[in-house]
Amino acid sequence: MYNNKLKVCSGPETTGWISEQLMTGKIPVTDIFIDIDNKPDQMEVRLKPSSRSSTRTCTSSSQTEVNYVPLLKKVEDTLTMLVNATSRQNAAIEALENRLSTLESSLKPIQDMGKVISSLNRSCAEMVAKYDLLVMTTGRATSTAAAVDAYWKEHKQPPPGPALYEENALKGKIDDPNSYVPDAVQEAYKNLDSTSTLTEENFGKPYISAKDLKEIMYDHLPGFGTAFHQLVQVICKIGKDNNLLDTIHAEFQASLADGDSPQCALIQITKRVPIFQDVPPPIIHIRSRGDIPRACQKSLRPAPPSPKIDRGWVCLFKMQDGKTLGLKI
């Protein structure tokens, strides 16, 4: 009876059941540990299921390993390709960043030239408007003023020759209702009003605003809110009030061309341009010392009796408590 159960059952459950039966004495020890020589059949029966199970398990494990090896190889190859592609992409991005940095550095001088070019453009437009009054065409230069007038009235256009008019004479013709002046000439005369400031003295010197000059000087100075930044504001304000921004700009560029530092160039302006000589610095009203920029704190000094800009006094800070501090460079 016991042997039949052994033939049917196998695995851990059988082992546990046999141990329980042995401990309780329900199965004799001789029925379990049989003699191979005397009972070969029973031994064979007991070992066969174990042998088949072991073989089946081994075969299944080997089959699983065989199935996973190609998949793992594919995953490894794919990851390798992905890493290589990412490395190439990173290298390309780094090269692109370097190119962009180089390009940005190359374009900075052009950006600085933009303001000067804009001023030149305005001056050139005014100059063209002024010369547009000289209504000149190619051809013979024998037409008199009367002949030109007659030709205009008849053909509604200038004759094929030069027709030069003085400004006052042309103004008289435009104001005279009996005289005929082509619309193009009248328009050119009106445009002359915008060129009234363009004279022989300032021709070729493009007008620059106080804001543009301040930005140009700021671009050359390191840091922010320093005593020299404050000096730039004072220079631009006084230069604007005296209509000498172009002169100040020329002095600044000349000092830089001579190899001076931006700070030295600003000091030279206060010493060379006459409007800064023996001029007291402006007074700035503040609530307390904390309103003064941090970068200027170390340059504050007690104000002397008569400070001057050309002696290094940029401005005076007057606080609500009556105390006055001077910004000295």
From Swiss-Prot:
Q: Where is this cross-link: Glycyl lysine isopeptide (Lys-Gly) (interchain with G-Cter in ubiquitin)?
A: K298
* Post-translational modification, as annotated: Phosphorylated by host IKBKE. Phosphorylation contributes to efficient viral replication and transcription.
Give yes or no: UniProt keyword RNA-binding: yes
The task this protein performs is described as: Plays an essential role in viral RNA synthesis and also a role in suppressing innate immune signaling. Acts as a polymerase cofactor in the RNA polymerase transcription and replication complexes. Serves as nucleoprotein/NP monomer chaperone prior to the formation of the large oligomeric RNA-bound complexes. Regulates RNA synthesis by modulating NP-RNA interactions and interacting with DYNLL1. VP35-NP interaction controls the switch between RNA-bound NP and free NP and thus the switch between genome replication and genome packaging into the nucleocapsid.
Q: Which family does it belong to?
A: Belongs to the filoviridae polymerase cofactor VP35 family.
Q: Hey, what's the signal peptide range on this chain?
A: none
> What GO terms in the biological process aspect are recorded for it?
symbiont-mediated suppression of host cytoplasmic pattern recognition receptor signaling pathway via inhibition of IKBKE activity; symbiont-mediated suppression of host cytoplasmic pattern recognition receptor signaling pathway via inhibition of IRF7 activity; symbiont-mediated suppression of host cytoplasmic pattern recognition receptor signaling pathway via inhibition of TBK1 activity; symbiont-mediated suppression of host toll-like receptor signaling pathway
- The protein's organism comes out as Reston ebolavirus (strain Reston-89) (REBOV)
Q: Does the keyword Phosphoprotein apply?
A: yes
Q: How does it assemble?
A: Homodimer. Homooligomer; via the coiled coil domain. Interacts with nucleoprotein NP and polymerase L; VP35 bridges L and NP and allows the formation of the polymerase complex. Also interacts with VP30; this interaction is regulated by VP30 phosphorylation. Interacts with host IKBKE and TBK1; the interactions lead to inhibition of cellular antiviral response by blocking necessary interactions of IKBKE and TBK1 with their substrate IRF3.
| UniProt-recorded name of the protein | Polymerase cofactor VP35
Chain positions found as Phosphoserine: S194, S306
Q: Where is the VP35 IID domain?
A: 204-329
